[in-house]
């Protein structure tokens, strides 16, 4: 195991219902992504060599970049649509938290696993991300689910998964974080990111 830092980030794991893809609610889709990100983080921390750490770094960046933009395009507009003024405040709060995470991810994605500040940068990023995850899983997403029919929730989950296929796979903190401008910016950035992905190493 690579010994960069002894800092531990507390990861909270909330249960995800085991449903088929066609019957996944939006909360299940989002929480499943959160579990993947926590797993990627732990795999980086437990890597026995720099090559393995780099592969999981690429996976973590790929997952987090797509997840963040997917939420901003599909989920946060629904906060504003269904949850009134509180929903608007939630959306702005979450966008602000995403922006901070994107800026940290932008720095982390260009770092090398053998740099002395590689793991400290990851820990700082994960600490902020975990706080955001806790808020979404304990309050924001359950609150939204209460205002959605099952059909609406299933449709949102499908849109969320579909959107992630077309968005950038690396962090672009200077890009817009609201649709439709974020959608347009993503369509331009995504092809370049996907070419970059072809040159990366993966788990």
From Swiss-Prot:
Major localization listed first in the record, in broad terms: mitochondrion
Gene Ontology, cellular component aspect: mitochondrion
Location(s) in or outside the cell: Mitochondrion
Residue sites binding Fe cation 2 per the record: 97, 172
Keywords of this entry: Iron, Metal-binding, Mitochondrion
Residues that bind Fe cation 1: 34, 97
Tagged with keyword Endoplasmic reticulum: no
Pfam family, one: Hemerythrin
Keyword Iron: yes
Gene Ontology MF term list: cation binding; metal ion binding
Family: Belongs to the hemerythrin family.
Protein's UniProt name: Uncharacterized hemerythrin-like protein C869.06c
Originating species: Schizosaccharomyces pombe (strain 972 / ATCC 24843)
């Amino acid at each position: 195991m690579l010994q960069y830092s002894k800092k531990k980030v507390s990861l909270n794991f909330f249960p995800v219902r085991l449903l088929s893809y066609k019957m996944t609610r939006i909360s299940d889709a989002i929480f499943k992504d959160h579990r993947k990100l926590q797993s990627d983080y732990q795999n980086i921390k437990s890597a026995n060599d720099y090559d393995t750490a780099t592969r999981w770094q690429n996976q973590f960046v790929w997952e987090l970049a797509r997840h963040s933009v997917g939420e901003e395009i599909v989920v946060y507009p629904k906060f504003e649509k269904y949850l009134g003024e509180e929903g608007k405040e939630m959306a702005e709060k979450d966008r602000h938290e995403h922006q901070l995470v994107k800026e940290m991810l932008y720095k982390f994605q260009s770092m090398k696993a053998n740099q002395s500040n590689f793991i400290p940068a990851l820990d700082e990023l994960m600490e902020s991300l975990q706080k955001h995850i806790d808020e979404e899983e304990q309050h924001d997403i359950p609150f939204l689910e209460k205002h959605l029919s099952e059909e609406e929730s299933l449709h949102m989950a499908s849109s969320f998964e579909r959107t992630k296929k077309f968005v950038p796979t690396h962090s672009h903190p200077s890009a817009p974080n609201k649709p439709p401008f974020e959608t347009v910016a993503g369509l331009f950035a995504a092809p370049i990111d996907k070419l970059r992905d072809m040159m990366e190493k993966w788990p």
